[in-house]
Amino acid sequence: MHKMRSRLAALAGIAVLVAACSSGASSSPSSAAPSTAASAGGSAAASTAAGDPKTAKTTAEGGGVDAICAAGKTEGQVTLIATPDNWANYGQMMKDFTAKYGIKVQSDKPDANSQQEIDQAKQLAGTGRQPDIFDLGSVVAAAHTDMYAPYQPAGWKDIPDGNKEATGLWINNYTGFIAIAYDSKLGDITKFADLKDPKYKGKVALNGDPLSASAGFNGVVAAALANGGSADNLAPGVDYFKNLTTLGNLIPVNPNDATVASGQTPIVIDWTYNQGGLISTLKPKGIDWKIVVPSDGAPVAAFYNEAINKDAAHPAAARCWVEYVFSDAGQNTWLKGFALPVRLQAMQKAGTVDATALAAVGAPATAPVQLTQAQTDAATKFLKDNWKFITIPA
């Protein structure tokens, strides 16, 4: 269920999205006026001097969305990796993309983390089976920019400068918050402190090892903030989980849909958009799945990042995929999966956001904490030296 995720954008980017969720704000100082080219489909931004859709660096250079996606259809498929169906509504995203463009989506290793995405791309380079698209956290993404092909989709101008690499090597796509998801039969849970209760012995799971999975990493950050720590001091977070382990409450299990459904992991610390997708699937099984952003610390958020593999076996289809996920339709699909899309502010201004989905997501009133790259690097080193009391399998 885990993927290595973290931050590449400025804190302001997330703060703006939180404001949009909380108050219905319709403008952002870091967003350009919404581009009509960002609507789903169409031949927007077509160029009279269009280049090859397989190597295009912009929508216009590829001849427009229609031309790019037509070329992608001839390639037959686009290969994704680390995109679980329930994660930010990726399952629906893939279905809608195929229905619209007739391009098959090959989804490999849905539970892979970011480093495994990169490893897979290297191991399968040139075979035709390598991933065409990456969806990465910052620790890994920042270390492998030489593996990406720059591309600027039709909605490029709607994306704040702080949420994208200048040439399009990577683009922040969506964000969310660290939350506690739980079976309501266990009683109300509102904060990290609640998880120390003896009645939760053997019931708490962290989504992924903090050394390799961003949900786990940011779970430690959130626990630190809830226990007197800060973005510069994760020791209280490590101590918190060490205590949970000693109590027997934290278990060495990497949670997934099956462990939740079976009752093995009835409490999961994870991203809102990962657990949000389980609400509807668990309901028929008699499980009322609740999600709460812990109240005993500032909320923790992080954007994910979209990038095209420069060694993509289906380069036009990869560009078509990027066009779709950053279109209004794609961004609203993420929103329906409890994820806040990067173009949210521009879409609100244009009146193209799904208001019902936006209202369902909700957002904490407090501005979220997002580690800088320097803080992420320091925290990673600290965890390597101090996270030794429990091993959460990949």
Put a short name on every predicted segment.
Residues 16-20:
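C-terminal motif of bacterial Sec signal peptides marking the signal peptidase cleavage site
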